[in-house]
Amino acid sequence: MKFLIIKPSSLGDVACAMPVVALIKKHYPDATVDWLVNKEYAGLAKAAGADNIFVIDRRAWKKVASWPKAFFNYLSVAAKLPFQHYDYAIDLQGLLRSGIFTALSNAKKAIGFADGRECSPIFYDTKVVVNRKLTHSTLCNLAVLKELGIEKDETWPSFAPSDTSSTLESFGLAGSEFFIAVPLTRWKSKNWVPESIAAVGTELKARHGWRGVLVGGSDAKEVCAKICALSPDVFLDLSGKTDWSQFLALSAEARCAVTPDTGPMHVMAAAGTPMIAIMGPTDPRRHGPYGDCSKVLQSKRRCLPCYHRDCVLGEEGKPSLCMADITPEMVVEAVEELLNELKTKEENA
């Protein structure tokens, strides 16, 4: 049996779709599961266990000079799909573009969300009813799998690489215990206070001897440099230096992670990283880390969740009020509680 998953973006949503591959293969051991995904997330599709990956380059459309390249990239992928003879095409994106790719796959059966945008449901044979505005992305994906007779069981897939030693050695972390911190998101309102991240790193090193590993894209270098300056000899700045395989390896070996609501949070959740998720303007029921090895901290302000990219109540240039409400002491306490809970759970297993 052959399946095509269509989930091009975004980072967090792609990470939440990773279990779909494993669950299909567990239910149908001889199945071939392919994935159509944006170029920058192809590494995650590979880590998820996809057999064949069809890569589209969405970023090529951003520059007029690259439009011919982008057009032929899309055309090339579209031309290949009908010859794969898929039994099922599963559109987890729910947009016009993904719906068109679903139709072009010529699968025997197309499945997608009933509330898909941009008229995408017209391309589906089966329309799955789930309120995606109020439901976690992972649970939405599980609802789609129910149409294939696949139910979630107690054994949840983990995407930690089998070999992490080479990654640890390449970054000078072999033999070290460390935690991961994510200092930057695309929304200013989601960013935690750099001084607070530095304070948490200092305290965790004093208590446990852990190093702090800062991760993110190249755009995080400035804030990472600030954190490193605030806590000398505590943090290792790996912003812009890891591919997805390396990031998953680091996530699998980290003692824990401290992160706001951002794509890497969901990738770490897929790797099974214990984490403290600091949630600001978004609803943790929908956007928080999925799984039972995390704790969520969120302010009790009545304005939440506001979904504003900039805090409309705070001062310009300063962290959003809801994120500033979360103190380093609260995070360190949450780390200790989570580790104790996981230790107790392991001892009782």
Describe each region flagged by the PLM:
Residues 1-349:
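Catalytic machinery of carbohydrate-active enzymes
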